[in-house]
């Protein structure tokens, strides 16, 4: 395997940038994919979270761009706003020496500002399909014309993008792009699903090289959890889950650890955030009902160490670069075993040890059995937390804090704000049309 990025064909200036960022040797997915993509092949790259997929496509795109630096050179589509912002940060850091221009096109940000940035033809656009589709529909040819010349299209977390929920928006995005024979298409994912794999065998345009498919550490059914990850569980009645959570977070082993606590619902995330703050934990949250500025600030606080605990829905479980997490807690058990694997992929990265603890009740047993079958590993019983300890140390305080948190949310009409936010999203396209009128006024 190549020992340096220079051996892979990465530009000298970029190799130096990687060295400056303490990224010395390419990972398996980078070593396999970069040379093949530089040959002109489309690519499907499958590797578990934390294996360096972003650099695998960013390094080669920046290498090629530096030889012909026009805009818009590449489009990266990704399912979440947070992931788009993170990818943009990595592009900006890698391309700092060459003064690259990156535009992020996601919901929750100023539509007019995005329109003006797109009109300036940035070198790279990183977008969520819904917001980019909105611009294609409503912002006019001057705004999106640069997308007609792109050399690279990247679908990051391709398994999610190819699901039904993104179908119509993705198709609309494709209408503005060059035909497949005039661009390279790169798909990267932690889960190489049948839908992703089927793209390899689609008919190719004349002269197009075969698609390159590479999977790393596929393990059982295409996904493996890190070998340095310990998976544990605690079996509890549902009405004392919060007390068990606080007891786990106060264990001597974890009292100073960074932790991500995953939940299935935004309401649960908000209750836990407020409850844990009342119990004097340093906590932040990340869920879809938060305004974009709050979500960004929460992630920055957690990364900077201002918050030790991040309460998150699955919006945070895919691809987000939170390298120092030592503990993952599944407060709620996901219905899909793959979501469990992506969640626990937040810890035990790059050979470091990490723990994943699942708080389970009677209704979760079937889900846990499916997860254990998927990862080919039995979870171990968590030691150090039992009924007596929880009753004596945490139950009353957690119950009181939860009740106060829910009363606060009721006073602030949190549930009503959720309904308003849903209505806003439902009328997003008409909103885009209104914003288009504002753009015309700005230009006139």
Swiss-Prot record:
The Q motif is unique to and characteristic of the DEAD box family of RNA helicases and controls ATP binding and hydrolysis. A motif (DEAD box) lies at residues 156-159. It is found in: Nucleus, Nucleolus. It catalyses: ATP + H2O = ADP + phosphate + H(+). The lineage of its organism: Eukaryota, Fungi, Dikarya, Ascomycota, Saccharomycotina. This is ATP-dependent RNA helicase DBP8. ATP binds at residues 47-54. A motif (Q motif) lies at residues 3-31. Belongs to the DEAD box helicase family. DDX49/DBP8 subfamily. Residues 402-418 have a biased composition (Basic and acidic residues). Signal peptide: none annotated.
């Amino acid at each position: 395997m190549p020992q340096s990025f220079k051996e892979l064909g990465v530009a000298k200036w970029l190799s130096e940038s990687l060295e400056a960022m303490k990224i010395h040797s390419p990972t398996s997915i980078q070593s396999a994919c970069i040379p093949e993509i530089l040959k002109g092949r489309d690519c499907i790259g499958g590797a578990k979270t934390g294996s360096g997929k972003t650099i695998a496509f960013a390094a080669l795109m920046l290498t090629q761009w530096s030889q012909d630096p026009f805009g818009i050179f590449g489009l990266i589509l990704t399912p979440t706003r947070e992931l788009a912002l993170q990818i943009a940060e990595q592009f900006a850091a890698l391309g700092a020496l060459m003064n690259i221009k990156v535009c992020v096109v996601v919901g929750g940000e100023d539509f007019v500002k995005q329109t003006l940035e797109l009109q300036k033809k940035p070198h790279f656009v990183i977008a969520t399909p819904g917001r980019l589709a909105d611009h294609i529909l409503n912002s006019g040819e001057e705004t999106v014309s640069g997308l007609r010349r792109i050399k690279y299209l990247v679908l990051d977390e391709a398994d999610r993008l190819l699901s039904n929920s993104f179908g119509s928006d993705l198709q609309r995005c494709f209408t503005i792009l060059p035909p497949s024979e005039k661009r390279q298409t790169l798909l990267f994912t932690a889960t190489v699903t049948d839908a992703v794999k089927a793209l390899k065998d689609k008919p190719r345009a004349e002269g197009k090289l075969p698609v390159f498919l590479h999977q790393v550490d596929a393990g059982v059914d295409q996904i493996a959890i890190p070998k340095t990850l310990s998976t544990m569980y605690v079996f509890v009645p549902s009405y004392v889950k919060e007390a068990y959570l606080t007891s786990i977070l106060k264990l001597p082993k974890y009292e100073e650890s960074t932790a991500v606590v995953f939940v299935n619902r935004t309401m649960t995330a908000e209750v836990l955030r407020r409850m844990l703050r009342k119990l004097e934990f340093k906590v932040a949250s990340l869920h879809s009902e938060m305004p974009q500025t709050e979500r960004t600030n929460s992630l920055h606080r957690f990364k900077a160490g201002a918050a030790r605990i991040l309460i998150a829905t699955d919006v945070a479980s895919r691809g987000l670069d939170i390298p120092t997490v030592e503990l993952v807690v599944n407060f709620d058990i996901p219905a899909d075993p793959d979501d469990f694997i992506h969640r626990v992929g937040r810890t035990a990265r790059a050979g470091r040890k990490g723990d994943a603890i699942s708080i389970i009740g009677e209704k979760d047993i079937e889900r846990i059995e499916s997860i254990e079958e998927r990862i080919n590993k039995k979870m171990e019983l968590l030691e150090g937390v039992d009924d007596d300890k929880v009753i004596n140390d945490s139950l009353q305080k957690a119950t009181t804090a939860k009740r106060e948190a829910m009363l606060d949310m009721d006073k602030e009409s949190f549930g009503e704000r959720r309904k308003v936010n849903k209505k806003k999203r439902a009328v997003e396209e008409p909103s885009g049309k209104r914003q288009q009128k504002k753009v015309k006024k700005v230009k006139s």
